[in-house]
């Protein structure tokens, strides 16, 4: 120590206040040195965001009554008849976005042609075809429509009819929805479907189908609410694992279904009429829908259960009518939509860029903004990890996926699960500040650091992130780390 430094130390030590100041300076020096060393052992990565359209499970534009790569519908027409056999691929690549969900629906008379004899091969085939085309299946079972009859055996079962042949709608046999035989036979179909398909990992969602044409929940012959409730309860009982979607039409029923865990769907998205004289086809987008969402209290249902929209007409039909596509798409985002059924009709060329932008916003969109971890780590200890994620979409992901960090070298690898529930990642920022255990059997050496969200059933990467670095196996490379058994951890 130099003479000057010695005199300075003695000066501090000869005074009580100086001793305190001296010790403080020594402590700060130690902490500064320790902090500097710790900072040297930290890696901070900031992946570069990408702006691609991503195909991810449970979100996006769906195919309708068909699967990826198959022939599209004409611009202004579609069929309500679901597929009952394999469909051939299109002769040329369809002008349609790739999608993770196929939405199909079938009539009761097809699924149960004789009482108690269910033709589930139809739905089994659709699930198989969806898997073969890289999709999951969303379904609705429909009692009848204005063109498709109830099963003949049901009409002869003693069930009550609500209308007569001489009525304006007499060509279609309208059931009495308060009749116990309707509840009995329809609930048997629903119960059988639930026993066979509830929890199937390749089933995306199931519509709650109850009253009226297509099971949409409206009819000139509406029963009192207790009967509607009973027809909703059979679905809640049959499907306790697969997400259910409540149809929008009847307010009290909509509120009841969503209060019991269902998401919701509507089937006239894009109807921009400002008035209507038809009580069963009111002006939807500019009258019914926005106000009914508030009046039924379902504004926040999207936070835990999905929202799905189906076009009124088709997208080319919107264009033909001169509808404001910007307003329609914006409204869908405001409702926090995850999936949209545009009836497998091609999007008009002039609107493609608008739909591409829309697809980048619907559902969830995960972006890793920042990740911090140790540069050198010793096996068998807890390692601090900090992550900042952004969900740039308008909805959460509704199924559980495991967020995993993988340490991989040419000789071995280890997967470390991050203890977060990604279903809680609402739009906006989410942060993980915690520590994870580094497996004790890791050998010394350099390891790549990779991340993924894994399907907990298969252990395979399931979610595409909006960042660079995706590798062929679906993992994202974010950095590197050194494992060193002798490394002291500060």
Role assignments for model-derived ranges:
Residues 40-84, 98-100, 131-135, 205-346:
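Catalytic-core regions of glycoside hydrolase
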Residues 89-165, 224-236, 243:
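Aromatic-lined substrate-binding rim segments of carbohydrate-active enzymes
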Residues 126-137, 161-205, 227-234, 238:
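An active-site-proximal structural segment forming one wall of the substrate-binding cleft
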Residues 359-490:
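Extracellular/luminal regions of secreted and cell-surface proteins that mediate adhesion/ECM remodeling
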Residues 107-120, 170-185, 212-224:
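The substrate-binding groove and active-site-proximal loops of carbohydrate-active enzymes
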Residues 102, 130, 193, 206, ...:
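Conserved, mostly hydrophobic/aromatic
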Residues 335-363:
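A eukaryote-biased signal for short, well-structured alpha-helical docking elements
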């Amino acid at each position: 120590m130099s003479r000057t430094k010695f005199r300075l130390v003695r000066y501090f030590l000869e005074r009580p206040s100086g001793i305190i100041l001296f010790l403080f300076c020594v402590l700060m020096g130690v902490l500064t040195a320790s902090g500097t060393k710790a900072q040297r052992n930290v890696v901070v990565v900031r992946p570069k965001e990408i702006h691609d359209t991503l195909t991810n499970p449970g979100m996006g534009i769906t195919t309708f009554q068909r699967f990826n790569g198959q022939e599209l519908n004409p611009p202004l027409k579609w069929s309500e008849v679901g597929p009952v056999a394999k469909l051939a691929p299109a002769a040329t690549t369809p002008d349609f976005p790739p999608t993770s969900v196929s939405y199909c629906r079938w009539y009761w008379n097809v699924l149960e042609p004789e009482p108690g004899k269910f033709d589930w091969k139809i739905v089994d085939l659709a699930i198989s075809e969806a898997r073969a085309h890289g999709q999951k299946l969303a379904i609705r079972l429909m009692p009848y429509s204005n063109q498709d009859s109830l099963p003949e055996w049901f009409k002869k079962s003693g069930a009550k009819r609500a209308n007569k042949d001489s009525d304006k709608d007499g060509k279609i046999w309208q059931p009495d929805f308060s009749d116990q035989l309707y509840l009995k036979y329809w609930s048997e179909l629903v119960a059988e479907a639930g026993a066979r398909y509830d929890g199937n990992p390749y089933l995306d969602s199931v519509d709650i189908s109850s009253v009226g044409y297509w099971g949409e929940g409206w009819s000139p012959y509406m029963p009192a609410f207790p009967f509607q409730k009973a027809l909703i309860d059979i679905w809640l009982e049959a499907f306790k694992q697969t997400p259910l979607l409540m149809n929008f039409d009847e307010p009290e029923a909509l509120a009841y279904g969503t209060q019991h865990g269902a998401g919701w769907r509507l089937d006239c998205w894009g109807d921009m009429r400002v008035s209507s004289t038809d009580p069963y086809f009111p002006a939807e987008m500019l009258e019914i829908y926005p106000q009914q969402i508030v009046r039924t209290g379902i504004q926040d249902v999207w936070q835990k259960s999905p929202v799905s929209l189906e076009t009124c007409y088709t997208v080319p039909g919107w264009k033909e009518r001169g509808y404001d596509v910007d307003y329609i798409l914006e409204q869908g985002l405001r409702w926090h939509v995850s999936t949209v059924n545009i009836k497998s009709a091609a999007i008009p060329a002039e609107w493609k860029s608008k739909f591409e932008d829309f697809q980048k916003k619907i559902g969830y969109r995960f972006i890793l903004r920042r990740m911090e971890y140790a540069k050198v780590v010793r096996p068998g200890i807890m390692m601090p990890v900090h992550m900042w994620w952004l969900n740039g979409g308008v909805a959460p992901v509704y199924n559980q996926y495991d967020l995993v960090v993988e340490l991989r070298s040419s000789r071995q690898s280890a997967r470390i699960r991050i203890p977060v529930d990604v279903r809680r990642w609402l739009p906006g920022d989410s942060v993980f500040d915690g520590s994870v255990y580094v497996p004790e059997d890791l050998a010394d050496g350099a390891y790549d650091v990779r991340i993924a969200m894994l399907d907990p059933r298969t252990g395979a990467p399931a979610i595409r992130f909006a960042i660079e670095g995706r590798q062929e196996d679906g993992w994202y490379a974010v950095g590197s780390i050194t494992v060193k058994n002798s490394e002291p951890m500060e």
